[in-house]
C-alpha cells in the first residue's frame, strides 16, 4: 500500500486537512481497479485508496471507465464513466435503476445529468446518454481517453472535492479538464513514462499527453526517484513540484500465508522452476528471459520456466521458445491475479525480472513476501 502524507508541492500543501478543514475530499481518476486488473496500475490504485481511506479526514471518489459492480466500495465511492450521462435523456427512475443495477444509484445518475453541458451533442451515446467504455486497453484507446475526459467534465461539475488526483497518462486529460472546471489543484501520479514503456522509441502522441498533464499539474507524484529524474530531465518539469512516492504491498493475509507455507522442500522437487511474472511487453524484456532460458537449458535440463502474464508480445515469446527448441520446458499460464500470483511464487525457486526499465515494480515485492 501507499502511506498517506501531506503533499508539499506548490499549491497543494495549503490543503492539509489538519489545518484547513475537517475532511479532505479527493476526486481521483483511474483506469483499472481490483478485482478486474490488467497490471500493476490497478494494484497500486487499490493500495493508495485503501491507505488514504484509513485516515479519518480523507474522503475519496474514484472514477473508473467501466466498473463491473463487484469492486470494493466499503471505503470510497466509485463512479463509472460508462454510467455517467453526457447527453440528456428523458428516462424514468425504474428504467434507470434496472439498467444501472449496482453500478450507480438512480439518484446519482440524475444529479450528474443535471450537470451535463447543455449545448453538448455526441452521437455515440446509449439510451441513458452515456458513452460506452471497454474497461480495458482497446485498439481505439485514444478515443476512450478523449471520451473519459469528456465525462470527467460532467463529474467535475457535480462532485464536491478539494483536490484532483489522476493516475497515469490515460487520465491526465481528465484531470486537466476537472482542474479547468473547478480551479482545484491537480496531482498527477506517474506510474511510468513512455520512455519506460517504449525503450526510448517514444510515441509523440503519448509524450504530448504526458507532458501536458505534467505542465498542468500542481504536484507530480513519481513511483521512484528514477521516474522523478525522468520527469525532470525528459519532460522539463520543475524539481520543486516532483516528489518520489514509492509503491508497497500489504502484508500477506493468514490464508495466503498458509498457502505459501505449503511449498514443498527443495529436496522433494524433481525440477527447479524459474519464473517471469508481469506484462509480456517490450518494457519488461520478456525476450531476454527466453534467451537466458535457452542458455541455461544448454547446461541442464532439470529446469522449467514459467512466463506468467499477458501482453502484446505473448505470442512472439511462445514462437520464440518453439524456435529455440525449448517449448517443452516452458509454461505460459496467462494473466495471474489475486491468490494465483502467490501460488506461482510459492511453486517457484527463482524469480527473474529482466525489465529494460522498471519505474517501481510491485511483483518483486510480492515475490519477496513468499521467501
Placement of each model-derived feature along the sequence:
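A conserved catalytic-core segment of Leloir-type glycosyltransferases
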Residues: 21, 58-156
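Conserved donor-binding/catalytic core segment of Leloir-type glycosyltransferases
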Residues: 266-293
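Short alpha-helical donor nucleotide-sugar binding micro-motif in glycosyltransferases
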Residues: 335-336, 343-348
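Aromatic "clamp/platform" in nucleotide-sugar-dependent glycosyltransferases that forms part
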Residues: 356
Amino acid at each position: 500500500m501507499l502511506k498517506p502524507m501531506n503533499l508539499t508541492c506548490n499549491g497543494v500543501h495549503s490543503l492539509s486537512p489538519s489545518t484547513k478543514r475537517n475532511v479532505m475530499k479527493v476526486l481521483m481518476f483511474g483506469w483499472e481497479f481490483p478485482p478486474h486488473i490488467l497490471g500493476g496500475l490497478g494494484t497500486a490504485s487499490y493500495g493508495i485508496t485503501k491507505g488514504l481511506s484509513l485516515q479519518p479526514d480523507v474522503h475519496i471518489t474514484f472514477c473508473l471507465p467501466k466498473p463491473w459492480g463487484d469492486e470494493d466500495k466499503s471505503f470510497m465511492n466509485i463512479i463509472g464513466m460508462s454510467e455517467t450521462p453526457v447527453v440528456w435523456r428523458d428516462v424514468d427512475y425504474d428504467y434507470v435503476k434496472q439498467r444501472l443495477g449496482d453500478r450507480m444509484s438512480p439518484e446519482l445518475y440524475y444529479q450528474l445529468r443535471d450537470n451535463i453541458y447543455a449545448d453538448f451533442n455526441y452521437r455515440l451515446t446509449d439510451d441513458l446518454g452515456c458513452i460506452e467504455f471497454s474497461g480495458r486497453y482497446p485498439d481505439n484507446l485514444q478515443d476512450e481517453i478523449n471520451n473519459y475526459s469528456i465525462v470527467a467534465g460532467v463529474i467535475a461539475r457535480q462532485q464536491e472535492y478539494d483536490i484532483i488526483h489522476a493516475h497515469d497518462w490515460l487520465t491526465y486529460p481528465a484531470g486537466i479538464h476537472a482542474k479547468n472546471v473547478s480551479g482545484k489543484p491537480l496531482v498527477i501520479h506517474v506510474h511510468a513514462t513512455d520512455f519506460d514503456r517504449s525503450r526510448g522509441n517514444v510515441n509523440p502522441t503519448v509524450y504530448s499527453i504526458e507532458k501536458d498533464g505534467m505542465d498542468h499539474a500542481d504536484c507530480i507524484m513519481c513511483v521512484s526517484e528514477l521516474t522523478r529524474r525522468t520527469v525532470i530531465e525528459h519532460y522539463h518539469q520543475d524539481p520543486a513540484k516532483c516528489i518520489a512516492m514509492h509503491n508497497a504491498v500489504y502484508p500477506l493475509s493468514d490464508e495466503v500465508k498458509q498457502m505459501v507455507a505449503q511449498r514443498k522442500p527443495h529436496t522433494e522437487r524433481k525440477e527447479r522452476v524459474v519464473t517471469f511474472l508481469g506484462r509480456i511487453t517490450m518494457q519488461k524484456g520478456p525476450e531476454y528471459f527466453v534467451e537466458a532460458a535457452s542458455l541455461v537449458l544448454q547446461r541442464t535440463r532439470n529446469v522449467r520456466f514459467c512466463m506468467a502474464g499477458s501482453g502484446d508480445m505473448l505470442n512472439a515469446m511462445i514462437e520464440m521458445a518453439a524456435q529455440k527448441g525449448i517449448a517443452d520446458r516452458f509454461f505460459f499460464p496467462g494473466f495471474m491475479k489475486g491468490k494465483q500470483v502467490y501460488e506461482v511464487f510459492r511453486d517457484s525457486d527463482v524469480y527473474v525480472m529482466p525489465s529494460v526499465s522498471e519505474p517501481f515494480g510491485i511483483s518483486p515485492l510480492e515475490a519477496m513476501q513468499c521467501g
